[in-house]
Amino acid sequence: MAAKSDGGGVGVGFAQLHNLDEAVGSGGEEDGEPGGGGCGGGGDGSEPGESSSMHICHCCNTSSCYWGCRSACLRSLLGRKPRRSAAADGGDQPLQPPAAPGAGRQPPTPSAARPEPPPPQVERPWLDCLWIVLALLVFFGDVGTDLWLALDYYRKGDYVYFGLTLFFVLVPSLLVQSLSFRWFVQDYTGGGLGAVEGLTSRGPPMMGAGYVHGAARGGPGVRVSPTPGAQRLCRLSVWIWQSVIHLLQMGQVWRYIRTMYLGIQSQRRKEHQRRFYWAMMYEYADVNMLRLLETFLESAPQLVLQLYIMLQKNSAETLPCVSSVTSLMSLAWVLASYHKLLRDSRDDKKSMSYRGAIIQVFWRLFTISSRVISFALFASIFQLYFGIFVVVHWCAMAFWIIHGGTDFCMSKWEEILFNMVVGIVYIFCWFNVKEGRTRYRMFAYYTIVLTENAALTFLWYFYRDPETTDSYAVPALCCVFISFVAGIAMMLLYYGVLHPTGPRAKILASSCCAELLWGIPLPPDVEPMAPEIPGYRGTQVTPTRAVTEQQEDLTADTCLPVFQVRPMGPPTPLGRPYLPEGPLIKIDMPRKRYPAWDAHFVDRRLRRTINILQYVTPTAVGIRYRDGPLLYELLQYESSL
């Protein structure tokens, strides 16, 4: 969700960075403007360190500025207005600060030698904003209807249902807010730059705290470092703000708003769009992980509970139905958003379109609704056996996931805990956790789910009370199986037509037709359209009859079909073929395989180190792991740190 560029500085959206060709720190000019100098101060005359304010807060001296603005926290506390740059005022340009060690400027590449960038993809920035706004609406609708329903149970005197409904709202929310605040503490307290020698919060490396902007050129001197009192006051205000936000259970809302702010800034401020993009991706990944955890701890149990209550009361009131629909929508939306962001975050995978994401929403809606209805029907009669069934299914799925081997976390015990959490997800729906062909695993999973749904539903049907359930027994059976079939149809539509790697239906159709028409595939070493070699015909001698008959028999045995397929060119790589030009930060550890997150998304120590490397190397344009393609090495990160 950062602004993409077609090489001419035209942003067409804030989706992932496929091919940015702006001259970031290259010393060249583009569209008449000097290339951004990053956080070390550049030719734009801005204050030193201002361009990196998303990562280095000027007053807090930290690499995680939670105010999301260019030191506005310090300016508001001290009553200072934003100062215009010297270049904008027509004054003298400040002295260029010395470059960071190992992060020198690269000479501009001649335009004739640079490859032509591909045409920009058609993306609309309002779609990205709308997607986040809809995610916020789904969140408020889910939590709001659950709280409203709990209050309604309390007014009616149903204290048991009130307690259960409120329990499935408050306990998951407290757990998720605690995890979110813990991440904030790790980022805010561990992201300081005091331990980095020669690095200050307002100037580039090796400048020191006494660097005065413009004083060396006779301009007005500006004090770089804020006072210690202002630093303490700003830190205290950040701590109070984040504490209040998380106590009000609004940590995810704040992260959604900050993600949208960073995405908009990445489209508006093209000279620093890479930094805004990285900061936005970190924030968006955090909020999606938190939402995924909360939905399966709160929305999924809440959905089963409300359906169970409606079956016990033998009535479907408006408020429980609305609460169930919003919980179901929250589950489907979070799963689709999670998988879309996961593909967007990896440069070795093509991003998912919004059409594909919407089809995924319907896929999850139908399959989860079929699963939950069968759960509620069975639990309305066999409460004890339903609990045993859920525990057994969770244990079996967790063992299956652990046995398959996943690579999501940084340690073995964290990986086992993650697999146990994914086992909870597998109670309700499919969740891909392993690279490779998923068709066989999905076929096995959905076969098991269909068998379980049918068994639970038919057991309820045969042991139900006909007097109270005849009015909805047959429609309930139809909903279970029709919803499951509709969900599988949506899944096939997604993988067959809207998958990011291309329509699978065309590939399967072409291979099947080739096998039906030819019987066997074309040998790879045969070139039927190859031209004759000059000079070879003149050296031939008239063959004898025996040799001619032998050659005719050989030709008849190896004859090729009349209609042949023209050889295709080299296949298009699955990832993004155009790598960004510029220095790269190398992480000396193997890259995790899809569908796992990259290590710098889940390891917060590594994320903080990358933030510091981005600060000391403002021209860095990408991150490469040890086993990935690398243009050239600039900085290395040892995995033992």
From Swiss-Prot:
Composition bias, kind Gly residues: at what positions? 34-46
Q: Which UniProt keywords apply?
A: Cell membrane, Membrane, Transmembrane, Transmembrane helix
Q: Does the keyword Repeat apply?
A: no
Please tell me one Gene Ontology term that the record gives under cellular component: plasma membrane
Report the source organism.
Homo sapiens (Human)
> GO BP, one example?
engulfment of apoptotic cell
What gene codes for this chain? Answer: XKR6
- In this chain, the stretch annotated as Disordered covers 20-47, 84-120
Protein name as it appears in the record: XK-related protein 6
Q: Does the keyword Membrane apply?
A: yes
Bias regions of kind Pro residues — which residues? 107-120
Membrane topology according to the record: Multi-pass membrane protein
Q: Which family does it belong to?
A: Belongs to the XK family.
Q: Which InterPro entries match?
A: XK-rel, XK-related_scramblase
Compartmental location = Cell membrane
> Which stretches are transmembrane?
130-150, 159-179, 318-338, 372-392, 413-433, 442-462, 473-493
